[in-house]
Amino acid sequence: MARNREQAMAVRRAVIAAIVNQFGHPRGTAGRVAGWVMAHRSSNRQRNSWVVSLLDVQPTDRVLEIGFGPGLAIAELARRVGDSGHVYGIDHSEMMLRQASRRNAAAIAAGRVSLTRAPVDQLPPSLGGPFDAILTVNSLRFWLAPTQQLDQLRRRLRPGGRIAIASQPRCPGATASTSHNAAREIEDLLQDAGYTLMRTETLDLDPPVVCILAANPDPLATADHQRQAPHPAG
């Protein structure tokens, strides 16, 4: 009896591990389950809605999501930009492309959403731009060269355009300290890639979600600020 329980527990651990390993690149049956978990876990839904609200997307905005998963944030963004804006998304998982396309079928048919299978280090030329806003939720840790890729994304942002990067550490034993450290690392990456930091927000989940907001510097606004700044007395 004890041996049967141990075998059952071992199988359960193996199944859970297989699903967890799928979150970076969902595929096959386990990937389908991972997509279902991402779409239906209440904390994920709350997290995505919160990040979109922080980005303050406006009607007519052109918005890009990197790593859209099952398409929850894409759906929220499409509602916010309305008929005059457009939402783009890339994800390197064919499974997530199918799930997100089904979830956003009406917006895609209406020409308001465009989803593409592509990794962040191979942005397709057809992606368009410049964008008013870019966001990514829990995908940065899978990027191979984050500073370089953030710099490439910044070049797709209009001057003054903003980016939101959210992280909710899912490693075993993650705490508020883990989230805080993740925020500091993301802030450093953004500054190294040429962004101007705006602010960092925290959502009180377990573990906490951090969202770092930054902007692509606007050269004209910077020049105006420098002209208006008081000159030191000679």
Regions found by a protein language model. Give the residues of each.
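A short acidic, Gly/Pro-enriched loop at the edge of an enzyme's catalytic core
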Residues: D121-I134
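Class I SAM-dependent methyltransferase SAM/SAH-binding core
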Residues: L64-Q122
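Conserved alpha-helix/loop element of class I SAM-dependent methyltransferases that forms part
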Residues: S42-D61
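A short SAM/SAH-binding and catalytic strip from SAM-dependent methyltransferases
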Residues: A133-P146
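Conserved beta-strand signature within the Rossmann-like core of class I S-adenosyl-L-methionine
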Residues: G160-Q168
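A short glycine-rich, Lys/Arg-flanked "PGG" loop and its adjoining helix->strand segment in the class I
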Residues: T147-P159
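Core SAM-dependent methyltransferase catalytic element
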Residues: D204-G234
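Short alpha-helix
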Residues: T178-A193
